[in-house]
Amino acid sequence: MKTFLKNHSYDMVTMLLNQIAIALFGFTLVLAAMKINNDVLRNVTSVFSILFYLVLLYIKAWDIGFKDKISVEQGKKSNAPLRGALISLCANAINYLFAVFIFLRAILPNVEFFDSVGSVAQAIAIFAQGMYTGILVNQIGGAPLNAYWISYFIIPLPAILVCGVAYYFGLHDVKHTGFFHKNQYPESDREPKRKD
């Protein structure tokens, strides 16, 4: 595990920074939509922000998988197709830490420590996951989704799933569209050239 963290700490930090940047972007768009009191626009901007975030993660995880492909083929690295999901899970560890504090606040509301730490964690989580804010303010059962502790455990799942799939595709050099991989070499440049 130590080697894994050493080899992929940069990737985890990059994914976390992508999350923070897109959270700011999404939060700003949602606030603008809420200012004009337009629920449809709020939901659409939130979905757009989430998709944009997932595309960034897809590109990053695919590149990691593609870079690992050679090491796996040469036997220098083990074939671990779930490595992308694990990298994303580690990058989302802070989100799950917030979720645990929010959960403890929900089940132990009379314990002052968990109430205060859970409140702070919820405020930070709402901001750190700003791309989901437009959806989380929708009411279900008389309360917004961000009032339910389970929401904070569900939010990181799309990122983990996308990174897992993208890493697997990168590891096997599977491309579904050229949009995501414009900077990759063409197939003709990937094969070693023979010298005559």
Task: Go through each PLM region and give its residues.
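Transmembrane alpha-helical insertion/packing segments
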Residues: 1-66
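Loop-to-transmembrane boundary segments
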Residues: 4-17, 77-97, 146-150
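Juxtamembrane "helix-exit" motif on the non-cytosolic side of transmembrane helices
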Residues: 25-38, 101-111, 139-140
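Transmembrane alpha-helical segments in integral membrane proteins
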Residues: 56-63, 145-177
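Membrane-helix interface/capping segments
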Residues: 56-87, 91
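Hydrophobic alpha-helical membrane-insertion segments
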Residues: 84-121
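Hydrophobic alpha-helical transmembrane segments
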Residues: 122-161
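Short, highly charged, low-complexity non-transmembrane loops/tails of multi-pass membrane proteins
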Residues: 173-196
